[in-house]
C-alpha cells in the first residue's frame, strides 16, 4: 500500500501538468501586472485576454479587432449549465459505481486513465487499514463531486435570478475556456476515485464507515463559504435594484457589507474558500487538488487586482482600508 501512495503522490500525470501550467500562467500574468508601470510593454491583446467585464474599461485602449471577439458577460450562465449537466452526469455514474458496483463506461474509464486516475491493486487491499484508506479516498471524491454539482446549481440559479448583468463583455477565448473548465474540474475529481483494472472501489452500504473528521470539516467550510458567496452576490445585485427589487440601472456602485468590508472582491475570496473546503474534504494531502486550488487562487487574485484598481480609480471615496483579495494582506 505504501508504494501505491508514494506513486500517487509523486507522479506528474497529464492532469497535474495541466493544472500546474494553468497556475503558473496566471501567476506570471499577475506578476506582470504588479510590475512597475513602463517596465514591460503593454500588449493590448494580452490585456484583452486577461480582463473581462468592467475591468476592460480601466485597461488600455482596445483595438477594433479585439471588439470583434467580444461575448456578453451574461453568458457566464452557460458555464454553469454545462457544469450542472456534465458533473451531474459524472455524479450519476460515480454513485452507481460506488454503491451498486456498476462499472464505468469503457470510454470514461479509458479517459480517466489517460488523465491519470488513482490506481489500486487487489493485493494491496488485503489489510483492513488499506481498505479504510481507499474507502476514505472514494468517499472524499464523492463528496467533492457533490459539492461541485451543488455549487454549479447555486451559481446557475444566481445567474438567472440574482445577478444583474450589464452590457459588459469577455473575450471569446475566455468564454470557450469557461465552457471547458467545469468539464475538466469534474474529470479531475472523478480521477481521484481509487480504481483497479475494471472498477472503482465499491463502498456499497458502508457509506459512513470510512467517514473522517476532515469530511465533516470540509462540508462545514463548503456550506459556510457558499453562504458568504451567495450573500456577496445578493449585495452586488442590490446595488442595481430599488427597495422593491426592480432593476433600475446597470451602473457600478461601491459594495458594502459581509466580506466587502475587508476586500473589493469578496465573491472571489468566497470562491477560493469553496475550493479550499474541497481540499480539506480530500484530507489536506491531495496534491492534484491543491494544484487546482493554486490555479483558482492566482486566477481570482488577478481578477481581484483589476477590480480593486477599477474601484479605486472610479470612486474617490472608496474605502482606503480595503484590500483587493485577501483581508489585510493583498
From Swiss-Prot:
Gene Ontology CC annotations of this record: endoplasmic reticulum; endoplasmic reticulum membrane
Record flagged with keyword Protein biosynthesis: no
Positions in the Cytoplasmic compartment: 1-19, 96-132, 190-206, 299-330
Top EC group: oxidoreductase
Domain of life assignment: Eukaryota
Cross-referenced InterPro entries: 3-oxo-5_a-steroid_4-DH_C, Dfg10/SRD5A3
Keywords: Endoplasmic reticulum, Lipid metabolism, Membrane, NADP, Oxidoreductase, Transmembrane, Transmembrane helix
Pfam families recorded: Steroid_dh
Residue stretches spanning the membrane: 20-40, 75-95, 133-153, 169-189, 207-227, 278-298
Any GO molecular function: polyprenal reductase activity
GO biological process, alphabetically ordered: dolichol biosynthetic process; dolichol metabolic process; dolichol-linked oligosaccharide biosynthetic process; polyprenol catabolic process
Catalytic activity: a di-trans,poly-cis-dolichal + NADP(+) = a di-trans,poly-cis-polyprenal + NADPH + H(+); a 3-oxo-5alpha-steroid + NADP(+) = a 3-oxo-Delta(4)-steroid + NADPH + H(+); androst-4-ene-3,17-dione + NADPH + H(+) = 5alpha-androstan-3,17-dione + NADP(+); 17beta-hydroxy-5alpha-androstan-3-one + NADP(+) = testosterone + NADPH + H(+)
PANTHER family in the cross-refs: DFG10 PROTEIN, POLYPRENOL REDUCTASE
Protein name: Polyprenal reductase
Organism: Mesocricetus auratus (Golden hamster)
Organism phylogeny: Eukaryota, Metazoa, Chordata, Craniata, Vertebrata
The gene coding this protein: Srd5a3
